[in-house]
């Protein structure tokens, strides 16, 4: 909940969501439905004011800031609609940065991601030298570099045209088939090329299962 003037706003209402190992979930919702709030909670960027979140047997609101930071670095990957790449770093440097920070960089896995996402010929380019699809593929590789247990994606292809969106989703779907990871995607795009095992609709803060 948050306060706006005299009103208390509840972006999410009586929401229960369980994510199991290797789950593939998609959450549809229009702008203002609460998608971003939900994904911020799943990625521990926000702590719910009511209720609780448990991740890997850890009660999130009981963790210190340092513990939350380590959890995000090692166990939760996040991809936003905007790529948030560091403009002064090359594509390759952006991808390996979280691994370097965590002191557990797997160079072979980095090369695997770069090859799978078909950006190996662009690895030395800066973000402003890349296409929108290439920048987003870089952001996806960066989110996966530490082999997180959970990948959270907020409108991951929202800035891309249909053909580029389909291409990016096909490439990452291929990666998902080769690694152990749970994936949650929030989108308004009902034609997103993704094969979930569960589909949800988020409307006015209420989450409803529509398939799965």
Language model: regions and residue ranges:
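ABC-type ATPase nucleotide-binding domains, specifically the catalytic core motifs of the NBD
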Residues: 3-5, 96-107, 116
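Helix-to-loop junction immediately C-terminal to a conserved catalytic motif
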Residues: 43
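Conserved ABC transporter NBD signature motif
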Residues: 51-59
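Short coil-to-helix segment of the ABC ATPase nucleotide-binding domain corresponding to the Q-loop/switch region
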Residues: 89-97
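Conserved ABC ATPase signature
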Residues: 126-136
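A short, proline-enriched helix->beta-strand linker immediately N-terminal to the Walker B motif
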Residues: 145-149
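Catalytic Walker B motif of ABC-type/P-loop ATPase nucleotide-binding domains
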Residues: 151-154
């Amino acid at each position: 909940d948050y306060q706006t003037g005299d009103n208390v706003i509840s972006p999410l209402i009586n929401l229960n969501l369980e994510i199991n190992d290797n789950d593939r979930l998609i959450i549809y919702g229009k702008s203002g439905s609460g998608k971003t709030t939900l994904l911020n909670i799943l990625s521990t960027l926000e702590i719910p004011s009511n209720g609780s979140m448990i991740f890997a047997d850890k009660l999130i609101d009981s963790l210190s800031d340092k513990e939350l930071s380590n959890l995000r670095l090692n166990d939760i990957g996040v991809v936003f609609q905007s790529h948030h790449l560091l403009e002064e770093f090359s594509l390759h440097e952006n991808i390996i940065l979280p691994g370097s920070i965590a002191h557990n960089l797997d160079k072979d896995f980095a090369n695997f991601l770069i090859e799978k996402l078909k950006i190996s010929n662009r690895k030395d380019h800066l973000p402003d030298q890349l296409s929108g699809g290439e920048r987003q593929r870089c952001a996806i590789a960066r989110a996966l570099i530490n082999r997180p247990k959970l990948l959270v994606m907020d409108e991951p292809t929202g800035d891309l045209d249909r053909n580029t969106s389909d291409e990016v989703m096909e490439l990452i779907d291929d990666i998902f088939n080769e690694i152990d990871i749970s994936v949650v995607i929030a989108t308004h795009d009902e034609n997103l090329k993704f094969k979930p095992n569960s589909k949800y609709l988020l409307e006015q803060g209420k989450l409803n299962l529509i398939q799965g």
